[in-house]
Amino acid sequence: GIAVETVTEDAHTSLRLHRRGYTSAYMRIPQAAGLATESLSAHIGQRIRWARGMVQIFRLDNPLFGKGLKLVQRVCYANAMLHFLSGIPRLIFLTAPLAFLLLHAYIIYAPALMIALFVLPHMIHASLTNSKIQGKYRHSFWSEIYETVLAWYIAPPTFVALINPHKGKFNVTAKGGLVEEEYVDWVISRPYIYLVLLNLVGVAVGIWRFMYGPENEILTVWVSIVWVFYNLIILGGAVAVSVESKQVRRSHRVEMSMPAAIAREDGHLFSCTVHDYSDGGLGIKINGDAQVLEGQNARLLLKRGQQEYAFPVRVARVNGSEVGLQLLPLTNQQHIDFVQCTFARADTWALWQDSFPEDKPMESLLDILKLGFRGYRHLAEFSPPSVKVVFRALTSLVAWIASFVPRRPERAAPTLSADPAMAQQ
């Protein structure tokens, strides 16, 4: 039966089935999809449950021991479980350079140049290797943001689960809610803000030590400051994630490209293409002129195999050839037919799977930089008035420093001579 000893019953049941000799097959065809969480707090709550459950399995039914699993299966299961123990190492990474800058403690007893010569090539090589292997599905550097957002919250439950694996209960993740206004979740972002302030103190002390400290430590101070700035960019991205965007759709839209037709009440028929749909409406593009009016009733014709179905709709908006349709009340049979024509199609999620652009590490790094600065801009935008004064002063200071950066003068456009003879010379 289903394993109930842990809060991640699906992974635990899968492990037990493999131990008993059952085999599983991976099908690279998306069969279904589920809603994501609407808020960062709900997302973190879901990941806390996942992290606790996987560590519980690691303690109660460790895949590295026991019988029934092949070596590859043991490694894969152990990797999936140990991944959720990244909270404490990530927090150490975000504060490690501060040990030297603030406390004068050497976490790595080696010259700064030697550390850079060993660490930088390894980081570049690891990033390029991951991009080559997983570039079609994952983008470089984004896991840094993901782990930073979760680190503070998954570290305590995973540590407790290692000590007492029976502690914890199953919590259902709420989905499908609405977000009326854009806002910053100050409660969730509080740990990131504390880490930002701590790293800013480290930068200030590092600059002071760079100017007035011993000469033999200048290079080490410089490397530590660069490390702190990298951490500040990652923390800025974590702050940007805590900004909740407005979510007013009650039904999630699914992208798709499907031929269809729309019939007006007077009998005129127009071919169109469905480019997105939900349980309450559709977005279509009419092939040609959109000869429908907003508020007009019509019938949408969809096909499944050789069978054709008609659904009553109302034109909600018209923007050129782009038309938004709202489904009118359907009978039970019509609703079943609509689901069969849309959500239940075998190729429903094919477009979603193939729509990801391939990873380009430098572009991903640039996106991370933009996200980090955007996080601090949102922090200033949504902060109390008394704090905004400080942010404005810092922004003015950064702009003043940036004004000293040399700029390449614009090249004057060449002037054409009016004399053809001179032009030939």
Model-assigned labels for residue ranges:
Residues Y183-Q425:
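Structured alpha-helical
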Residues G1-A155, T415-Q425:
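Non-transmembrane catalytic domains and loops of membrane-associated enzymes and transporters
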Residues H43-I44, Q73-Y77, K167, A174-K175, ...:
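Alpha-helix boundary/capping detector
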Residues R20-G21, L64, L101, E180, ...:
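Single-residue recognition of alpha-helix boundary sites
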Residues F58, F65-G66, F159, H166-K167, ...:
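Residue-level signal for alpha-helical context at structural boundaries
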Residues N171-Y183:
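Short membrane-interface loop/juxtamembrane segments of multi-pass integral membrane proteins
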